[in-house]
Amino acid sequence: MDEDKLKYKLKLISKYLAEGKKLHAIQILNNLIDESGTEELYFQLAELYESMGFVDSGKKILLDKIELNPEVDDPKLFLGQYLLRNSQWFEAIEVLNSISNSTPSSLFLIAYSYMMLKEFELAKEYFNKFIIHSGDNELKHEANFYLAKIEYELNHFDSALEYAKNAQYIYSDFWELNLVLAKVYYSLEMYTHAITPIKRALQLNPKEASIKEYAGRIYFKLEDFNKAENYLSEFIEMSSEVSAEIYTLLAKSFLKQRKKEEAKLFFELALNIDPEYKPAANGKEELQ
């Protein structure tokens, strides 16, 4: 196709998209693909279908491109990312595995897919493969962050701490990494060490309920019962579901401050959720 004609049609597509005329843009893109078949046009059309909610149509466009050029990796990588965005984890893994030897970034995406499927051991394997084959880039530090989360879920707290510290090189100002660090220190009973990351997480994202929960847990262990009360109360206000454990922890925070009526109320709330929860039953009994 003549270059000037191609530029004109691409400008026309941009104009239609700006005006919200997506069907017009799709028609022109389909015609351009028939005439030139360039990779970027397939990608643009797939993303346009995706933006309209036609995920399967976008996937078909990308599969058509792969069928035309099965030896080329880029369309497969793009399809893998596309499937990932749309939570089609198993299909993403299948596509990306076909290029894992030639495209290191696919290892990261496979690992992420396994993590979302809660296949943590497989996720670890692929994240570690990615780290070995990647340079010192931001994605490597992101892999360390995810490995910290995975190791925490597997109760491997020492290795979770190591990965979290590695991720700090770039992600020190990311609230979730600070929360992971605080949770790991809490699980290792290193409560004083947990203070700095939980404070940082609170500063970075004061509206995140899970940060309030762990702030309450940490301050309770440090016997700062007033702060424990405040953060646990905030967590309860922000949450639609609260466990008997959290109600009991708040009740104990009140009890340590000799606020017996408040303690009784929250022990009872805990027992309403789980009548067999012994810490709440024992706490209420102590008030008799």
Where do the model's predicted regions map?
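Canonical positions in the second alpha-helix
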Residues: 31-32, 64-65, 96-99, 129-130, ...
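Canonical tetratricopeptide repeat
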Residues: 11, 44, 78, 109-112, ...
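Structural marker of alpha-solenoid helical repeat scaffolds
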Residues: 34-35, 68, 98-102, 133-136, ...
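Register position in tetratricopeptide repeats
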Residues: 18-19, 51, 85-86, 116, ...
